Regions:
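Conserved NTP-donor binding/palm subdomain of two-metal-ion nucleotidyltransferases/polymerases, i.e.
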Residues: 1-114, 120-388
Length: 388
């Protein structure tokens, strides 16, 4: 398999990431590292290993580092204020995703993130949303119509990161996954920010895996798997066994196996025997297809039929189309009437803007788009143990 990789189109990018070798023009390497959100981490790795990175890459990485440090200072102020609000309302708010994961990196600025994600119990939304709006947050109108099943983002009053409020962190085939109710027994206080909570590490790892491979179908690139390497670096046999058990319970065992195979490949590591036994490496064709998507970091927005259709029949297709066009009615109830109207007016046009060109190429039979669609279909079918 490695011979195929080294002869492949993505060998120069792997060489940059693993050894700091520059086998392509600086502009191409810089564009790739930016798209993968790896510049701060690449700079840090280069300094540790003594790599001679090109000046353009170094300058760009330093700029991203300073910007990320400033942005995370603003984020920490927001987190403190949200923690105080949670204590005042006596509502548990669970911090997830980037702001949570950054804490396991050697330095938090190595892990860029652009928003703050909170998980909340659905019954607490009527109390939390008015209170957070009173803090000065406003619905981010430009993005209000882009969400199929969860709340639009909220923007802070002045400067800072967007706030994403979730009642579930995923939805697949009509099921809400990774909800507050499913996690409630494992959450624990987030010591740096009183009033906020964080998930059980195993629960959050399974969510991270699902988010990268199932929800985003690998198009987020390298970063989710670098996250996973840092997140699990201190785990023992008990945590690995618990993750394997949970992955089987949620029908995510193949997804987890693929995630750890990709993590080992990207980080150039060998997992302990326990991990290798619990999560066997997928077949070569599946692994190669996944690697190509990860390196490319998703150049096309393909429809998520495999993820979002509740049933593989006409009724399932109609439910899928209704969800895409109208949004999730349960989640929408939390929105003010004006925002509901805005969502339904914007939704068709923004769907057309986001997905129209790719869907048109797919319908016309454009070779590259068709090939990407077929690769994604095969990959998702294998992950779900389905026959095409």
């Amino acid at each position: 398999m490695e011979e195929i990789d080294q002869a492949g189109v993505y060998a120069p990018y792997l060489a940059l990431w693993r050894q700091g070798d520059c086998l392509l023009p600086e502009r191409a390497l810089l564009a790739w590292a930016q798209s993968q959100r790896l510049l701060p981490l690449l700079l840090w790795r280069g300094k540790k290993a003594g790599w001679a990175l090109p000046d353009a890459l170094t300058r760009a990485a330093q700029n991203v580092r300073y910007r990320e440090q400033a942005q995370q200072m603003l984020a920490e102020n927001q987190l403190r204020a949200l923690g105080v609000l949670a204590q005042k309302l006596d509502i548990p708010l669970v911090l997830v995703k980037g702001a949570c994961v950054a804490r396991v990196y050697p330095e938090t600025w190595l892990r860029p993130y652009n928003d703050i994600d909170l998980l909340i119990a659905e019954e607490h939304l009527p109390y939390f949303l008015p209170a957070v709006l009173d803090l000065g947050y406003t619905w981010l109108g430009a993005l209000t119509g882009q969400r199929g099943w969860h709340l639009p983002p909220l923007a802070p009053k002045t400067t800072g990161l967007k706030l994403e409020v979730h009642t579930a962190l995923a939805r697949e085939r009509g099921r809400s996954l990774f909800t507050f109710g499913q996690w409630t027994t494992g959450i624990h206080p987030f010591i740096p920010f009183p009033g906020l909570w964080v998930p059980d590490p195993v629960d959050h790892a399974l969510y991270m895996i699902h988010h990268a491979i199932v929800h985003h179908e690998l198009v987020l690139g390298f970063l989710p798997f670098i996250d996973l390497a840092y997140w699990t670096q201190s785990w023992g046999e008990a945590e690995w066994q618990a993750l394997a058990d949970q992955a089987r319970t949620f029908d995510l065992y193949r997804v987890a196996s693929l995630s750890f195979a990709l993590t080992a490949w990207l980080s150039d590591i060998v997992w302990p025997r326990t991990v290798q036994q619990l999560f066997p490496v997928p077949p070569d064709d599946i692994l190669l297809a996944a690697r190509r998507i990860v390196i490319g970091a998703g150049t096309q927005k393909l429809p998520h039929l495999q993820r979002d259709m509740p049933e593989r029949n006409l009724r399932g297709l109609l439910k899928y189309l209704g969800l895409i066009l109208l949004g999730d009615p349960v989640t929408r109830q939390a929105l003010p009437r004006s925002e509901k109207i805005r969502f339904y007016l914007r939704r068709p046009f923004q769907l057309l803007s986001n997905h129209g060109p790719t869907l048109w190429r797919l319908v016309r039979g454009e070779r590259r788009t068709r090939a990407a669609w077929q690769v994604q279909r095969r990959l998702q079918a294998w992950l779900r143990d389905e026959h095409l």
